């Protein structure tokens, strides 16, 4: 019962806050809420194996790491913006060095299957266009020893 009352209260408060707002203002408010919630998907700074410097938003920045027998997935950059202020294009430059195990840098968009950007020792450079909705760039590792340098603008 308390959950229903709480949910109804949020709906009413939200309605009052948005009353008198234009369609664009409502969309901007919604976009801000969705973007704030999306940062939960990113791997926390303390849980990362390397060093991350945030760029102008959660979609951009640099990440460098040296891995030693690491297995797991790190979601490094991204979010769920409906209308990203900096546009839909991202420039990605990545250098991956695999000494042992496997590692792949990927891009996942919405409910689509992840797209592998690089999974062998070498470099990757491209510009991708983000569709609306959730977009994340990460690295998936299995007993991975090696390094990564990732720059996204």
Predicted regions and their residues:
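Positively charged n-region of N-terminal signal peptides that target proteins for export
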Residues: 1-5
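Extracellular and analogous surface-interaction loops
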Residues: 69-90, 127-132
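C-terminal motif of bacterial Sec signal peptides marking the signal peptidase cleavage site
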Residues: 17-20
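Transition segment at domain starts
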Residues: 24-81, 115
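A short beta-strand element within beta-rich, extracytoplasmic domains
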Residues: 88-98, 139
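Short, surface-exposed beta-strand/strand-loop-strand elements in extracellular ectodomains
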Residues: 100-116, 152-153
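Edge beta-strands of jelly-roll/beta-sandwich modules across compartments, strongly enriched
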Residues: 141-153
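A glycine-anchored, Pro-Gly-centered beta-turn/N-cap motif
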Residues: 61, 131-135
